[in-house]
Each structure stands twice: as C-alpha cells, then as structure tokens.
Amino acid sequence: MKKIFNLSVIALLAGFFAVSCDRNDEDEIQNVESIKIDSVKIAQDTMDVFTIQTIKTYSTYPSACDNFFGYDYIRNGLERNVVAYSYTINGTCTQATRVGVNGFNFRPEEKGIYTFKFWNGKDNSNQNIWIEKTIVVE
C-alpha cells in the first residue's frame, strides 16, 4: 500500500511539473532595442539642488506588442545621455501605432547647468540625433 501511495505521489508531481513547464510562446519577449524619443517634457528648467523632478519622454510604438523596457542613463559630469529601450512580445497584437509616455526622476546633487541629450534616432549618414535640454541647478 505504501508503494502504491509513493508511486501515485511521484506520478502526481511529475504530471504537475509537466503541465507547469508547458509554456505558451505568446507574450514572451522576442526583442529588445532602442526606440527613438520623439519629445521630452521638463516641467522646470531651473531647480534647486537636492530637489526632485520627473522628466517625461514620449516615444511612438509601432504596435501593441511593443512596450517600454527601460532607459540607458549615462552620466558624464553635468551631461546626461538618455536612450530609451522597448521590448517586443510574440503575440497577437493590434498594429496601430501609439504614443507612450515614460519618465524618470532627476535629483541633482551639485549646482550647475546640466545638459540632457535624448536619443532621437539616426540621420541619413547613420549619425546619432539628440534632443538637447538644459536644466539650471541653483
């Protein structure tokens, strides 16, 4: 009787793991790539040191399968380069383009003039195009 019980528990667990590992390929991330930032909204172009403001970026996504993944935020002194990334899922999605808004918090720790460069794609010569914004920190 104990042997039958052990075998049934093993069979039950094996069946559970077989079903739980049966993954649906839809909604899996297929690709992550940079997406151009179309525009930027900075509420205050002058702010105090150690205060926080949210900087918003707007990007156009080609379908409902494409969504915001994150930012690459590179600091170099008082200069900031910002590149947005999107991910694409493998699923049944509408192909209508849409504008997505995302943001990040900026909290300066020293006074000065900060220059932000937001990646806006590449030109015909394959050179990066940047949207430049400045924030004066007092």
What are these regions (language model features)?
Residues 5-6, 136:
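Sequence-pattern detector for short linear motifs
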Residues 29-138:
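First exposed extracellular module after export/assembly in secreted or surface-exposed proteins
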Residues 1-2, 53:
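General secondary-structure edge motif
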